[in-house]
Amino acid sequence: MRIIMGLMKSLVFGPEEGDVDDLRRKYGLPPSQFITLSNGVIIHLRDEGESEDPVIVLVHGHSEDLHTWDRLAKHLIGSFRVIRFDLRRHGLTGPAPDNEYSIESYVSDLSMVIKHLGIDNFVLVGHSMGGRISVKYTIENREKVDGLILLSASGAPRKEKTP
């Protein structure tokens, strides 16, 4: 029964920070990288391909991680510099110190990842919740986004209920 309760807790609340550290040591091998953003979030990312190639940034959906893109990334690397990362409380990124999980916080993390990597322009691809994050990022940073690709993107929240 304890095992079932522990699994349910992890599914609902995500892993504890200590659990994430163990997972990072076991699964965070190259080409994985970890960067600490100015807000204290430790982001797990992969930056693959040649630095002079056009950049494509892949943003996964809710309850996914950067491995969602493994098959696609395999085909893109060689023609593109492929950036993918785990959103906060997903994959090996773990929980955020501020315990904030709004779309705005995810967009802010995306902005900081882009800045940290020194990327000027790129194509942005978002799936599910990652699509919503990508749309909001693009609206706020049009000068950086050369193209936006949405795959089964979640919609924007409604201010009024549908009758």
Walk through the language-model features, giving the residues of each.
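A conserved amphipathic alpha-helix that caps or lines the catalytic cleft of carbohydrate-
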Residues: A73, I114, Y137-T138
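Gly/Ala-rich beta-loop-alpha elbow adjacent to hydrolase catalytic centers
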Residues: G126, G130, S134
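Conserved catalytic-core motifs of eukaryotic protein kinase domains, centered on the activation segment
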Residues: T68-D70, T93-N99, K159-K161
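Active-site loop/oxyanion-hole signature of alpha/beta-hydrolase fold enzymes
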Residues: Q33, S38-N39, R46, L87-V125
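Alpha/beta-hydrolase fold catalytic core
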Residues: M1-I56, S79-F80, D120
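Conserved HGGG/HGGXW glycine-rich cap/lid loop of the alpha/beta-hydrolase fold
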Residues: V41, D47-L92
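Flexible "cap/lid" loop of the alpha/beta hydrolase fold
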Residues: V135-E140, D146-P163
